[in-house]
Amino acid sequence: MASTNDLKNGLVLNLDGQLWSVVNFQHVKPGKGGAFVRTTLKNVLSGKVVDKTFNAGVKVDTANVDRREMTYLYNDGTDYVFMDPDTYDQVGVAASVVGDAADYMLENSQVVVARHDDNPLYVELPASVELDIQHTDPGVQGDRSTGGTKPATLETGAEIQVPLFLNTGDKVKVDPRDGRYLGRVSTK
């Protein structure tokens, strides 16, 4: 149990038998009436986002979520297999749990696997990942009808928009949360 005054981003709450992660919170103290906490919560399993308001100081049930850094090994067709680098235990995680993170994971990459009661909840990637461009069409000088970007296929199979000056074989930095191009990685 925790107080609503102790809420922070990333905290997982157990509300009505479902797990909700705090995405955003704001303590509000109006001129008249009691203080309250306005939150944005994301359902850990379904991804549904809702806004919920709590009175300040109310006790809420927190969930014990084990966030463990693991190494992605391989995909066996139905599950993605991860290994704990400390104990060498291997854990299979269903593709539905991994979700869009699979588009940006390479073998032997470090990820965080969150589990509750030994059930995997989600896979969290770093804020940016570096991947090679496997294929992209050459950029044509003066071609600005597309806003200066073109589609590129990464080595994982994901497709993102990149600037026209990038070519096949270049290494780029990508934000795995939304698939946004962040920059080119120097090969020096």
Swiss-Prot record:
It comes from the Bacteria. Its main location: cytoplasm. It is found in: Cytoplasm. Keywords: Cytoplasm, Elongation factor, Protein biosynthesis. InterPro entries: Elong-fact-P_C, NA-bd_OB-fold, Rib_uL2_dom2, Transl_elong_fac_P/YeiP, Transl_elong_KOW-like, Transl_elong_P/YeiP_cen, Transl_elong_P/YeiP_CS, Transl_elongation_fac_P. One of its GO terms (cellular component) is cytoplasm. Gene3D superfamilies: 2.30.30.30, Nucleic acid-binding proteins. GO terms for biological process: peptide biosynthetic process. Pathway: Protein biosynthesis; polypeptide chain elongation. GO terms for molecular function: translation elongation factor activity. SMART domains: EFP (SM01185), Elong-fact-P_C (SM00841). Involved in peptide bond synthesis. Stimulates efficient translation and peptide-bond synthesis on native or reconstituted 70S ribosomes in vitro. Probably functions indirectly by altering the affinity of the ribosome for aminoacyl-tRNA, thus increasing their reactivity as acceptors for peptidyl transferase. Belongs to the elongation factor P family. This is Elongation factor P. It comes from Saccharopolyspora erythraea (strain ATCC 11635 / DSM 40517 / JCM 4748 / NBRC 13426 / NCIMB 8594 / NRRL 2338).
